[in-house]
Amino acid sequence: MLKVLQQIPPENGHILHCYSAGSQFLDDFIQTGALISIAGNVTFKNNSSNVKEAATRVPASRLLVETDSPYLAPAPKRGRINTPNFIVYTYTEVARLRGIDVEDLAEQVRKNFSGLFSN
């Protein structure tokens, strides 16, 4: 996928949904104009180190947060059917990892999302 995006970059940007590829590819994807979307698996205690690292390394201007409903319900709701109501847990964890307020994260994500779809 990276090679295709590098050869034929989308004109209006694109989203990498539920990013989990790890930091070794992060900069390359960002250079293609991608917004990196972090899902509920960032809250998992096991098997989320790639996602946690990505959540801290994505430039603020390239970050999105998503539910991935009905899948990947965040802790403490893991194992349930995910709903948009659970997004607060994902935002809380991403904000904690980045050392910022949840409100500031939410405002940045709103700007990023609006910027992508206003073109």
Where are these regions (language model features)?
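Catalytic pocket-lining loop regions of alpha/beta-barrel enzymes
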Residues: 1-64
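Divalent metal-coordination and catalytic microenvironments
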Residues: 17, 29, 68, 105, ...
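Residues at secondary-structure transition points
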Residues: 20, 45-49, 78-85, 100
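Conserved short-loop catalytic and cofactor-binding motifs
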Residues: 39-42, 75-78, 93
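Ser/Thr-centric signal marking residues that sit
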Residues: 43, 67, 90
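A general structural signal for short secondary-structure boundary/capping elements
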Residues: 60-68, 108-115
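Short acidic/histidine-rich active-site segments
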Residues: 61-83
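Mid-to-C-terminal alpha-helical segments outside catalytic/metal-binding sites
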Residues: 85-119
